[in-house]
Amino acid sequence: MSIDVTDYRDIFLNDRPLMDARAPVEFHKGAFPGAVNLPLMNDIERQRVGTCYKHHGQQAAIELGHQLVSGPVKEERIQAWAEFARTHPEGYLYCFRGGLRSQIVQQWLKSEAGVDYPRIGGGYKALRGFLIDTLESALTDCDFVLLGGMTGTGKTEVLAQLRNSVDLEGHANHRGSSFGKRATGQPSNIDFENRLAIDLLKKRAAGIDQFVLEDESRVVGSCALPLPLYQGMQQYPMVWLEDRFEQRVERILRDYVVDLSAEFQAVHGEEGFGRFCERLLESLDNVHKRLGGERHRRMRVLMEEALAEQGRSGAVELHRAWIEGLLREYYDPMYVFQREKKGGRIEFAGERQAVIEYLRQRGKSQA
C-alpha cells in the first residue's frame, strides 16, 4: 500500500491531480483548483452515517456505510476512481482529515481494481492549513504595492503585464465594481482564498517577494479578502494609473458591454442577451441610493435605450451616454475623494506605459 504523502508544497507547485473523496456538500463549500469530486458517499449517505455515528457509535456507522455503498453503487464508484487514477497516475486522493473515507477508497481501489493510489496525509484539512500558513507568511515576509486609478483606466490590463502581480479580481471571477458580475458565478470564499494562496506560493517559488495588487474594497463581489491582507492594504504604498476620459469610456464599453454580452451569450446561448440586459440593469439599480432618484432614472432610461438598440441592430454606440454620465456624476467624484484621502501613500502617478515601467523598475530595485 502506498505511503501517505505530506509534501503539500509539491502538490500545489506542480498542480498534482487531486481526487476529493468528500461528499459534494463539503466539496462545494471549499476545494482546490483542479480537484475532482469523486465521493465515497453522497450527501444523503454521509448524513445518514453521521446520524448513526452520533447515536450508535463508530462501528455501527461503518457497517451502515458499507451497506449504503455496496453492489452496483460500489462498483460504479470504484470504476470512476480507477478511471481517474489511471488517467492521472501522478495524482493523489484525500478526504477531510486523511482518515477512514480515503483509506476505504484506497483499499477498494487496490483490492477491487488492482490500482495502488497514494493518499494525502491529513487530507483536506492539512492542505487547507498549509495554504492559510502560506498566505500568512507571504503577508509577513513580502512587500506589497497597490495599483489605484479611476474606473476604466485599465488596471487589470497593467497587472497582466507584470510577472509579480496578483489579480484579486481574476481569482474572484468578478471585476470588483457594482457592475463587476460575470456570466459565470464566483468561487466560494474558501476557494478564492485557496487560489490566492497558491498564486503567491508559485510566485514566491519563482523568486518573487514583492507583489502588485489592485486597490480593492474588502469584498470583491461575494468574495471577502482575508482580513490580514485587507488590513495591510490600508497602509501599503500606492501607484496611481491615469488615462484620458475618452479612453476610459471606450475601455468600459468594451469590457462591460461588448465583451460581457458576448460572454453571456457564450454561456447561456439564446437566453444570453436577455440575461446580460437584466444583469446590467440590476447593476445600475444596485447603486440607486448612491446615485439618487433623479440621476438613477435618467441613467436607466439611457441604458434601456442603448440595450434596445443593441438588441435590434447589434450597435453599441448608445451605451456611451450612460457610461459617460456614470463616470462624470458618480465614479469620478468618488475616486477624486479617494485619491485625496490616500494621497500621502501615492509614490508615483502616470499613464499606462509609465506605470508599467515604474513598477517593473521598482521590483528590480527592491529585489
From Swiss-Prot:
Family annotation (InterPro entries): Rhodanese-like_dom, Rhodanese-like_dom_sf, SelU
Rhodanese domain span: 12-136
Keywords tagged on the record: Selenium, Transferase
GO BP terms in the entry: tRNA wobble uridine modification
Enzyme Commission code(s) on record: 2.9.1.3
Catalytic activity line of the entry: 5-methylaminomethyl-2-thiouridine(34) in tRNA + selenophosphate + (2E)-geranyl diphosphate + H2O + H(+) = 5-methylaminomethyl-2-selenouridine(34) in tRNA + (2E)-thiogeraniol + phosphate + diphosphate; 5-methylaminomethyl-2-thiouridine(34) in tRNA + (2E)-geranyl diphosphate = 5-methylaminomethyl-S-(2E)-geranyl-thiouridine(34) in tRNA + diphosphate; 5-methylaminomethyl-S-(2E)-geranyl-thiouridine(34) in tRNA + selenophosphate + H(+) = 5-methylaminomethyl-2-(Se-phospho)selenouridine(34) in tRNA + (2E)-thiogeraniol; 5-methylaminomethyl-2-(Se-phospho)selenouridine(34) in tRNA + H2O = 5-methylaminomethyl-2-selenouridine(34) in tRNA + phosphate
Annotated disulfide bonds: none
Keyword Glycoprotein among UniProt keywords: no
Enzyme class label: transferase
Any GO MF annotation of the entry: transferase activity, transferring alkyl or aryl (other than methyl) groups
NCBIfam families linked: PRK11784.1-2, PRK11784.1-3, tRNA_sel_U_synt
Subunit text: Monomer.
Function in brief: Involved in the post-transcriptional modification of the uridine at the wobble position (U34) of tRNA(Lys), tRNA(Glu) and tRNA(Gln). Catalyzes the conversion of 2-thiouridine (S2U-RNA) to 2-selenouridine (Se2U-RNA). Acts in a two-step process involving geranylation of 2-thiouridine (S2U) to S-geranyl-2-thiouridine (geS2U) and subsequent selenation of the latter derivative to 2-selenouridine (Se2U) in the tRNA chain.
Designated name of the protein: tRNA 2-selenouridine synthase
